């Protein structure tokens, strides 16, 4: 009898334990943060997402959801490249043996904070899939001190080479380069960083940012890739035709990009270097002649449109995921009847999983500006009065310091069937219309930018021609003899920066007061 009672008690305890574990797991699962992850590529969401292209009044053609989701997913961790002599002991050996590891593991993420931290990893580690290379020549160059020093490259304070990444795969260790963080991190003189802020090219920056570009350029050429996160491997045509297919605007009879067809590699490199003085990169469908500075991602959650020319709506987190996918591996070159690619051009055959893009977007939404060192003193208070008096708030409306509306590019007459989604101020501030009218990213509009964070952003106006607030409010910038602090056309020492003349009539004292106020935002 005692034996039967003991067995019964043991079974009862086992059942109780199992029930307790089940209840505990159920409770933990009920407390788990379960995000509602939208589909990145959704045909219904894509239908009215883009703004029609100026001069054609048609939206760019996007690949279908079926084609997008047929791309294989890529979910690999990457590791920093250390400057020779700064690599930790055993690091290279570790890379040879660690094997491929997942960039994001959704099943391990139980809180919103976990997802945001996973998004930071995507932001920092996700690489440009089209630039990943196993070529031993490039891998050796990335580990060769003399080769790096010939490019004037220097390590960051932690000993790493900015933007370069190692990728352990099933085929060995590849060299690649950062995707998001290459452009959307600003380094301060002390080596600290502002995630989400655009890099500067006229202020202190990682000494190895652009001097190290020769290695990236060599990889791009070897893989038949145009700069600016191109989602394609170009065909067998000469480099000039690659450029035309990346940037040409055939529906414009005065298309400046026609001249690219005969460019040599050296001519391309010269023009590309000049365009980078804007604080930006000529993205696919953008322009080497009408550059766009890298935008600030801090505060993007409150922005209604994406890109300087409002190429796409920002209606929800799904749109930010969609845009990240678009510019990384899903862009096209089809505009109505105009199909820009050659028959032997190949799309990058990879994409990030939806979970990675969702985590990335969450992280970007979470970004905060650094502590503002500028005091709200009497000078700044006087500047706030001037800001209100001059009517600046009509466009740069507090608290976001943007109305989230669009202004007309100089000379643009909107069509009669403007989509209802566009909130347009029927005014033009007179800035250079090239990006908005002469490129495939041209919509005819410029969005009103937020003034929040102008103290750290640097490079003003959409083309980054203005390098400081002092230059922005200097009446002399309107003169042909002006020497821009930022972008200027190739081989031009002087260049007038027209448009947005608000505040130029103020006297010197009032200008300084207004600038002091703007720096507190």
Where are these regions (language model features)?
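Bacterial N-terminal signal peptides that target proteins for export
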Residues: 2-13
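Periplasmic c-type cytochrome electron-transfer domains
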Residues: 28-521
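Bacterial N-terminal signal peptides
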Residues: 14-21
């Amino acid at each position: 009898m005692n034996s039967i009672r003991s067995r019964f008690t043991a079974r009862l305890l086992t059942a109780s334990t199992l029930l307790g574990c089940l209840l505990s797991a159920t409770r933990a699962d009920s407390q788990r943060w379960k995000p509602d992850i939208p589909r990145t590529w959704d045909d219904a969401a894509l239908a009215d997402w883009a703004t029609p292209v100026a001069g054609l009044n048609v939206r760019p053609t996007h690949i279908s959801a079926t084609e997008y989701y047929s791309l294989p997913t890529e979910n690999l961790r990457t590791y920093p490249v250390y400057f020779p002599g700064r690599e930790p002991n055993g690091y290279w050996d570790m890379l040879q043996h660690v094997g491929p590891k997942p960039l994001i593991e959704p099943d391990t993420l139980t809180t919103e904070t976990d997802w945001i931290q996973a998004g930071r990893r995507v932001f920092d580690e996700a690489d440009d899939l089209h630039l990943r290379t196993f070529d031993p020549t490039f891998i050796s160059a990335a580990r060769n001190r003399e080769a790096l020093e010939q490019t004037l490259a220097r390590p960051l304070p932690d000993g790493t080479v900015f933007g370069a990444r190692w990728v352990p795969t099933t085929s060995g260790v590849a060299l690649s380069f950062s995707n998001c963080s290459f452009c959307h991190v600003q380094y301060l003189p002390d080596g600290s960083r502002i995630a989400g802020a655009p890099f500067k090219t006229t202020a202190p920056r990682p000494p190895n940012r652009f001097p190290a570009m020769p290695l990236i350029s060599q990889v791009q050429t070897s893989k038949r890739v145009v700069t600016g996160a191109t989602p394609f491997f170009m065909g067998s045509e000469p480099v000039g035709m690659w450029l035309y297919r990346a940037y040409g605007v055939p529906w414009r009879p005065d298309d400046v990009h026609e001249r690219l067809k005969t460019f040599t590699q050296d001519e391309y490199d010269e023009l590309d270097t000049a365009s980078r003085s804007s604080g930006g990169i000529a993205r696919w469908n953008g322009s080497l002649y009408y550059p766009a500075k890298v935008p600030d991602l801090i505060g993007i959650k409150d922005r209604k449109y994406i890109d300087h020319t409002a190429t796409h709506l920002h209606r929800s987190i799904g749109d930010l995921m969609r845009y990240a996918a678009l510019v990384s591996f899903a862009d096209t070159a089809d505009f109505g009847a105009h199909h820009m690619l050659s028959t032997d051009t190949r799309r990058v055959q990879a994409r990030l999983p939806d979970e990675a893009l969702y985590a990335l977007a969450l992280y970007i939404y979470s970004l905060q500006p650094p502590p503002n060192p500028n005091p709200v003193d009497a000078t700044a208070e006087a500047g706030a009065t001037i800001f209100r008096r001059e009517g600046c708030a009509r466009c740069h409306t507090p608290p976001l310091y943007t109305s989230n509306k669009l202004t007309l590019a100089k000379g643009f007459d909107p069509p009669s069937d403007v989509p209802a989604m566009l909130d347009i101020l029927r005014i033009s501030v007179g800035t250079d219309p090239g990006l908005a009218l002469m490129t495939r990213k041209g919509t005819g509009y410029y969005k009103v930018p937020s003034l929040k964070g102008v103290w750290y952003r640097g490079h003003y106006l959409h083309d980054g021609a203005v390098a400081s607030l002092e230059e922005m409010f200097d009446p002399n910038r309107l003169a042909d003899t002006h020497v821009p602090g930022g972008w200027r056309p190739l081989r031009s020492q002087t260049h007038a920066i027209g448009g947005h003349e608000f505040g130029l009539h103020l006297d010197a004292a009032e200008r300084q007061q207004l600038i002091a106020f703007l720096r507190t935002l």
